Structure formats: structure tokens, C-alpha cells
């Protein structure tokens, strides 16, 4: 019997019953298997032209960088500064996107003979983006041209007060506010009237386009050096891995093993991603889980300039030292993160906000470098918008993570009268606020969220490609999926479901026993299945028959074998409810109870015999109607009766706990 307490997820099977079984011949011409072809067609790649772009587009297929609004003006000013030997400073951000953006332009400008430096604010004391003190200091150091990367789009007021003699170019990819900075140039594909066709570039992608434009203008050559850094930053910033981002990431990762960027090479080795047997790096999650956290650790715990130093040094010895240092810093970050996560959970209980539609969690002197990660971990538990703030000297600095149904940037904008500063995207943002305004902010944000979110929005959805028998999950099948790489946002790794899998063995694994491993029958074979971070609850027991959702992988340990990374699991005999089933039950129920109340046993018996409903599903359906107050139960002479009730408001099935728990995916 399966244990209780696991998180409920909704499984959305993308393969519909009416899905065409015929695979167009052009897929075979490109050596695409039928299984992969079905996945690609579901993702809209249903013509040979679309497939060819997906499989073969390279750096030569990138758009003309001068299509980007502001590019011509920005490049003209940069080239003038280079020719006149002006001091140029690249002003970046402290995350991986900011570090790689800064490194791309520093390496490019140095290569063109520029007198260039860089500046990245300290996360802990300066916060995100431009600040007045930094601008004044940079001007005193003799800089006459400042170019931002991955920041600046929301700094119109500050730029209007810039020091005399300091020109500014803004390059960014964040959502532009109504008022744009008045400066030499604003380069951001999201700004109005920007004709650049691809809008989803990360900050490093925009910086890479600036580098291309500089060389096209000066040398007439399309410059593609440093695309490795664009790949790293694009993956780390979790932007869409489609179109030009897919090109940057795929082409950049191809160069990882032969890169001339000493810091990147050293970090690949120090992180364990590259060793003597490594033949290629094709999976984006190797970067997102292996490289990005280590580079991010610099900006979170130490100073992000260490990351830029690593990616711009020409010394192999310095590169090895800095890479090792970042790995040590990452270990420190992990411990700080664990401590704050535990404190945040206690704070949620203390505030009694577990049922809030948006969780606003504040703590005194929490390390600002890890609150974004903590917010992400809390979101995984509660599946609703999470805002984590650290309070120091009367000011709270917050990091936000959201769910697809809730635009957190718009939510912050709606409360901007309470905020000192804010910025970000639909799914992630940052802000600052006076500490005494946090309770009012929590109250207003929850009212805003409650008006826009339904209970259904707060239940995670697993987008499952299709249901497969385990016997179909072969090593060859898994290798065929590699053509999808790089996978990430908008091009996810495919996950699959299987039904009626028999659990042969089940046990805890790992030093802290937080993980779980079982073996599932697949015909004559046994397949290993792993559950990461299950906590105190065993997902299943030996002897269970289960349905599960999994990501397949080839595990290389004494040879290749199939392993499943499990995402969710259900007992095979769970009786699940669908909207159609409930509508059918309700129609027959209203006829049966039209004139008068009837005994519960009589209602159930008649609906089973006349309606053909299975007993357990029928019982669950009737329980849903009771929870929604469409049906009431009362006793008369020791017998239970049902009475129909008239709905007085628009009904939402997700308000029923029984439906949420047992609904059909």
C-alpha cells in the first residue's frame, strides 16, 4: 500500500487520443525516430522547414544585430570612445547572466584595443542595478563612457542625475517601464518599436549582439568569439531556449571542450563536468546544475567580480585558483541557504500564512545572496508566488519567484507606491521596501493575488509527453531524445508516464536517507527508479502497483542501463475524477432528486444500476457535490437522506478537496 502525504500534482498528457499515428516521411529523411517525431510535432515542428531550423540553424542564422533599436547609436559611441582612448566601464549585474554579459563586452572591447574596466555592485550593500554613489565614483576615476549589461532599463531617474561628463549606454533584456532612460542609446529587444525579430535574449545575448555589431561595423566580420559565455549565461538565466537562444546555447556548448577562455575551461574541470573521458557536453542541465551555481556563488556570498576575473583572465594559474575558490564558495552558499530555508519555514508558521495566495516571508539579516534560492524552494512546497525579504537597517530587500498563472512583475507594479524600487520578469523579480510597510504590502499583495488566482492555479502541472510501457523505454530511445538538446524553458526535457508498474524492491538511499530507489518490472527486465529528496515519506513499497511520471536517462555505471528519475507517483488503483464524469453524475442526480429527498443508499444503488457508475467513483462524485453545497445530507428516523440544493454562485470544482485530490489528469 502506498504511503500518504505526497504532494498532489496534475498530470497533463500532451498526446491526445485523436493524435495522428502517421509520421510524415520528412522526419525519416533527417534520421528522426518515430517516437521523437511525435514529440516534435506536439511542439509545433510539423513541417520540414521548421524541423530544419530546429536541427541545423547555427550562428550564421542569427539576425542582423543592427536591427535592434539603439544599436547603431550605441556602437557609434563605443567606437568613438575606442578611437579617442576614452576610459570605458562595463557596468554589470551579480548573477551569472550579469557576469557573462560583463565578460563578453570586456573581452570584446579589450580585443579592439579599448581602455576598458568593469564594475559590478555588491549584492549585500549596493543591491541590483545602477546606484548614484557608484556613478560618482566611476566618474572620479576618469571614466567617460559607461555601458550597462543586464541592468539599467529601470534607472531613468538615476540616469537623469548622472555625473557631468559621463555618457551612458543601456543594454538590458528586462521588461521596460513606461519611462525609458534618456541616454546615448537604449538597447533592449523588448522596447516598443524595436524591429529585432527575436525578443527572448538574455542580458548576455544582448551583449553578444553588441559585440557582433562592433566588429561588423569596424571590421566587416561577424564576430562569434565568446559565444561560450553567451551559452552559459542564457542557460543560467532560464530564458526561452528557442530560436536564437537555442542557437547561442547549442553552438556555445559545442566549444566548451576546446574553448580558449581559460576561466571557463578551469571551471568545467573543477566542477567535475569535464574529465579525461568527456567527449562532448550537450545537455543544458550539466551547465544549470554544474557550472551556474558555482559562478553564481561569487555574487551571492563573495563578490561577483571574482566571476568576471575568472572569465577574463589570460593566466592559467589564476584561472585554476579562482575556479577552485568558487567551488569552495559554493559549498559555503549551500550551508547558508539550508539555514535560512529552515528559518523561513519557521517564519511562515509564526505568521500563520500557509494558506495565503502569495507568501511574503521576511527575516532579520538573512543573507541577501540566497533569498532567491530560498524563495524557489518554498515555491516547490506551496506552489504559489513566494516573496522572501531580508531586513537590515529598516529596509527590506526582496526576491520573488512565481507560478505561470501569476505575473509577479505586474503584481509589484500594482503596489509600487509602497516600494522603494522593483524590477524583473513575469516569473522572477526583486524589490526593496521600508520595513514598517511590509505588513501592509503582505496584505495588499494577497488581496491582489486572491483576486487573480484560483485554487487550480496553485496546483503544479506536470506536462507529460505520453504514456509508455516501460518496455519501450530503451537505451536507444533515450539517446534519440538528445536531438532535443539543449533543453530548458519552452523546450523542456520530455517526461513520460507509465501505468501499472509493479514495484519489486524499494529502499532509502543516500547518506542522509532523503532519497529513494525502487526497481520496477518491465517485462523480463528490472528498471531502476530514483526519487530525489522525498523527505520523511516513502513514495511506494515493494508489492505496490503504481502509475508514475518520470524522466528517462542512461546511467553509466559498469555499462549503460536505463534509469528513471521519478517526478510523481500514484497507486494504480486510485479512482480519479474527471469533469465529464461529474457532469454525467450530476445530470442523473438532479433527475433522481427532482421532486423530493431520497435515502442515500437508494440514490447510490439507482445511480450504479441505471447510470452505470462504478461505486468508488460515484461515492467520490457525491462527496464533491456535498463539499460544493449542491447536495445536502440529513438524518430521518435513523436513515441518511440526500437533498438537492440550488447553486447560488458560480461553482469552481477546485474548491472541492476531494476533486483536487482525485481528479483525472
What are these regions (language model features)?
Residues 94-98, 151, 173-174, 189, ...:
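Generic detector of well-ordered alpha-helical packing
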Residues 104, 181-235:
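Short alpha-helices
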Residues 96, 123-128, 175-177, 610-614:
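Short, small-residue-enriched loops and turns at beta-alpha junctions
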Residues 16-144, 164-165, 215-440, 467:
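Hydrophobic helix-and-loop "lid/oligomerization" segment in the mid-to-C-terminal part
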Residues 149-201:
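Histidine/acidic-residue-rich, glycine-tolerant segments that coordinate divalent metal ions
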Residues 1-19:
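N-terminal amphipathic/basic leader segments beginning at the initiator methionine
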Residues 2-3, 105, 110, 246-345, ...:
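Acidic, two-metal ion nucleic-acid-processing modules in DNA metabolism proteins
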Residues 144, 184, 547:
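Conserved acidic residues
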Amino acid at each position: 500500500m502506498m504511503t500518504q502525504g505526497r504532494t498532489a500534482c496534475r498530470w497533463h498528457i500532451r498526446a491526445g487520443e485523436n493524435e495522428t499515428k502517421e509520421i510524415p516521411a520528412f522526419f525519416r529523411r533527417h534520421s528522426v525516430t518515430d517516437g521523437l517525431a511525435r514529440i516534435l510535432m506536439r511542439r509545433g515542428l510539423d513541417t520540414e522547414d521548421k524541423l530544419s531550423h530546429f536541427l541545423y540553424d547555427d550562428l550564421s542564422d542569427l539576425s542582423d544585430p543592427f536591427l535592434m533599436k539603439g544599436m547603431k547609436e550605441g556602437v557609434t559611441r563605443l567606437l568613438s570612445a575606442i578611437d579617442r582612448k576614452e576610459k570605458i566601464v562595463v557596468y554589470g549585474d551579480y548573477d551569472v547572466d550579469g557576469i557573462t554579459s560583463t565578460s563578453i563586452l570586456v573581452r570584446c572591447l579589450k580585443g579592439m584595443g579599448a581602455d576598458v574596466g568593469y564594475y559590478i555592485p555588491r549584492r549585500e550593500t549596493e543591491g541590483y542595478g545602477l546606484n548614484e554613489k557608484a556613478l560618482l565614483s566611476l566618474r572620479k576615476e576618469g571614466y567617460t563612457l559607461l555601458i550597462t549589461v543586464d541592468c539599467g532599463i529601470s534607472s531613468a531617474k538615476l540616469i537623469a542625475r548622472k555625473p557631468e561628463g559621463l555618457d551612458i549606454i543601456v543594454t538590458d533584456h528586462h521588461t521596460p517601464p513606461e519611462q525609458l532612460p534618456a541616454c546615448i542609446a537604449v538597447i533592449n529587444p523588448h522596447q516598443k518599436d524595436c524591429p529585432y525579430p527575436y525578443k527572448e535574449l538574455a542580458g548576455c545575448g544582448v551583449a553578444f549582439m553588441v559585440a557582433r555589431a562592433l566588429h561588423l561595423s569596424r571590421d566587416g566580420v561577424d564576430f562569434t568569439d565568446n559565444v561560450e559565455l553567451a551559452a552559459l549565461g542564457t542557460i543560467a538565466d532560464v530564458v526561452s531556449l528557442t530560436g536564437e537562444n537555442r542557437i547561442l546555447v547549442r553552438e556555445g556548448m559545442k566549444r566548451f571542450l576546446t574553448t580558449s577562455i581559460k576561466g571557463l575551461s578551469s571551471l568545467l574541470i573543477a566542477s567535475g563536468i569535464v574529465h579525461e573521458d568527456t567527449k562532448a557536453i550537450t545537455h543544458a542541465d550539466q551547465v544549470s546544475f554544474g557550472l551556474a551555481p558555482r559562478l553564481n556563488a561569487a555574487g551571492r556570498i563573495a563578490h561577483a567580480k571574482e566571476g568576471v576575473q575568472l572569465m577574463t583572465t589570460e593566466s592559467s594559474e589564476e584561472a585554476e585558483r579562482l575556479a577552485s575558490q568558487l567551488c569552495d564558495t559554493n559549498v559555503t552558499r549551500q550551508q547558508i541557504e539550508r539555514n535560512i530555508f529552515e528559518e523561513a519555514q519557521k517564519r511562515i508558521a509564526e505568521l500563520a500564512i500557509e494558506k495565503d495566495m502569495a507568501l511574503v516571508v521576511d527575516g532579520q539579516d538573512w543573507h541577501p545572496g540566497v533569498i532567491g534560492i530560498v524563495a524557489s524552494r518554498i515555491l516547490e512546497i506551496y506552489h504559489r508566488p513566494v516573496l522572501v525579504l531580508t531586513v537590515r537597517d529598516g529596509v527590506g530587500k526582496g526576491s520573488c519567484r512565481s507560478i505561470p498563472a501569476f505575473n509577479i512583475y505586474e503584481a509589484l507594479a500594482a503596489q509600487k507606491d509602497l516600494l522603494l524600487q522593483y524590477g524583473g520578469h513575469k516569473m522572477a523579480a526583486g524589490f526593496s521596501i521600508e520595513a514598517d510597510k511590509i505588513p501592509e504590502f503582505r496584505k495588499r499583495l494577497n488581496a491582489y493575488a486572491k483576486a487573480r488566482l484560483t485554487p487550480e492555479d496553485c496546483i503544479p502541472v506536470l506536462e507529460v509527453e505520453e504514456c509508455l510501457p516501460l518496455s519501450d523505454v530503451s537505451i536507444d530511445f533515450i539517446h534519440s531524445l538528445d536531438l532535443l538538446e539543449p533543453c530548458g524553458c519552452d523546450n523542456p526535457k520530455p517526461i513520460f508516464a507509465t501505468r501499472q508498474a509493479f514495484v519489486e524492491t524499494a529502499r532509502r538511499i543516500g547518506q542522509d536517507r532523503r532519497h529513494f530507489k525502487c526497481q520496477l518490472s518491465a517485462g523480463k527486465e528490472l528498471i531502476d527508479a530514483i526519487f530525489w529528496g522525498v523527505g520523511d515519506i516513502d513514495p511506494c513499497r515493494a508489492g505496490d502497483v503504481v502509475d508514475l511520471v518520470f524522466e528517462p536517462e542512461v546511467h553509466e555505471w559498469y555499462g549503460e542501463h536505463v534509469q528513471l528519475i521519478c517526478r510523481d507517483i500514484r497507486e494504480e488503483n486510485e479512482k480519479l475524477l474527471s469533469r465529464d464524469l461529474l457532469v454525467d453524475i450530476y445530470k442523473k442526480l438532479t433527475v433522481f432528486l427532482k421532486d423530493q429527498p431520497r435515502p442515500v443508499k437508494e440514490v447510490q444503488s439507482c445511480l450504479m444500476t441505471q447510470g452505470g457508475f462504478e461505486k468508488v467513483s460515484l461515492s467520490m462524485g457525491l462527496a464533491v457535490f456535498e463539499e460544493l453545497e449542491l447536495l445536502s445530507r440529513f438524518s430521518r428516523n435513523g436513515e441518511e437522506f440526500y437533498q438537492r440544493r440550488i447553486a447560488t454562485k458560480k461553482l469552481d470544482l477546485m474548491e472541492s478537496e476531494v476533486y483536487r485530490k482525485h481528479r483525472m489528469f
